[in-house]
């Protein structure tokens, strides 16, 4: 079998035309505060970068194994904390995970596939959002139940890329933070870094549960920006900058955030990250077995 070569993650993220808006640079660095057109285009593309519409319903009624998301979520959060990855990386990794799970089934009875998927999603997100990304073996921190060889992770990365149609420049709530903060606070310049940091932290916390999956990325971002800015949702006037949003939906998100910082929607006990016993995967299954199973997954 030919050696797997990792795809060029810088130039081939998705199949959009080359003259489309570069949302990757927007996502990483923020965008000009006057870029209303860019924001409108991002809102139009939200659905392309979201889980399938019935994903939340299937999680709630048991059609999808809810524990799969819990296990992957727990490790991603723990790994990001240990590796000192930021909330942008968490949000992007969870975006990939939810989109993948909404359209692609993992085999039942093979717990290792959940961990491998989590590692692949975090690895892809880190390559976009983080400056210093460790090698794949060093990425697998946090005492995971399984540790995989680099080649196995790379194969899962390729599967994720194909399932997501190479759309990794995802529009998430983080993409709108600076825009909404600037509109709410009337800044002519970038909003205060403290507000941006707090907003990103709150957005990352919303990934811990599933209730926020009901809402669009722009709705979550607007609600978070209003919340951290201390605005009263009933009194705030939704100007033209918010015209594409439904006020009642934004208000509902704000109530969820302000009630308990999203902990009521968290599905991890006491809002903590799950713990997994450490066991090297190579001790239980061969690389050939992993490769064979990954082939069947795709």
Swiss-Prot record:
Cell cycle found in the keyword field: yes
Pfam families xref list: Cyclin_C, Cyclin_N
Keyword terms, alphabetized: Cell cycle, Cell division, Cyclin
Record-level GO cellular component terms: cytoplasm; nucleus
Keyword Translocase carried by entry: no
GO terms classed as biological process: cell division; stomatal lineage progression
InterPro entries in UniProt: Cyclin, Cyclin-like_dom, Cyclin-like_sf, Cyclin_C-dom, Cyclin_N, Cyclins_cyclin-box
CDD domains given in the database record: CYCLIN_AtCycD-like_rpt1, CYCLIN_AtCycD-like_rpt2
Family: Belongs to the cyclin family. Cyclin D subfamily.
Subunit details: Interacts with CDKA-1 to form a kinase complex.
Function: May promote cell division.
Protein name: Cyclin-D4-2
Gene that encodes the chain: CYCD4-2
């Amino acid at each position: 079998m030919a050696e797997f070569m990792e795809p060029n993650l810088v130039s081939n993220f998705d199949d959009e035309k080359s003259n489309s808006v570069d949302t990757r640079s927007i996502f990483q660095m923020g965008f000009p505060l006057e870029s209303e057109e860019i924001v409108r285009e991002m809102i139009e593309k939200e659905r392309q970068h979201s889980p399938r519409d019935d994903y939340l319903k299937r999680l709630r009624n048991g059609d999808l194994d809810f524990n799969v998301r819990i296990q992957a979520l727990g490790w991603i959060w723990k790994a990001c904390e240990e590796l000192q990855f930021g909330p942008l990386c968490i949000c992007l990794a969870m975006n990939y995970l939810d989109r993948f799970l909404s359209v692609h089934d993992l085999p039942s009875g093979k717990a290792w596939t959940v961990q491998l998927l989590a590692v692949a999603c975090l690895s892809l997100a880190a390559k976009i959002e983080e400056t210093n990304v460790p090698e794949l073996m060093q990425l697998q921190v946090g005492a995971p139940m399984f540790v995989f060889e680099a080649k196995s992770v790379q194969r899962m990365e390729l599967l994720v890329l194909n399932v997501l149609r190479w759309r990794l420049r995802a529009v998430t709530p983080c993409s709108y933070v600076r825009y909404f903060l600037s509109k709410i606070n009337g800044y002519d310049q970038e909003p205060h870094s403290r507000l941006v940091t707090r907003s990103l932290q709150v957005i990352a916390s919303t990934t811990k549960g599933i209730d926020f999956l009901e809402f669009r990325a722009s709705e979550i971002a607007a609600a978070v920006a209003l919340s951290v800015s201390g605005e009263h949702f009933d009194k705030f006037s939704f100007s033209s900058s918010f015209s594409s949003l439904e006020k009642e939906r934004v208000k509902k998100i704000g109530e969820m955030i302000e009630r308990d910082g999203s902990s009521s929607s968290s599905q991890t006990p006491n809002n903590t990250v799950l713990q997994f016993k450490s066991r090297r995967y190579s001790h239980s299954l061969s690389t050939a077995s992993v490769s064979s199973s990954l082939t069947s997954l795709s």
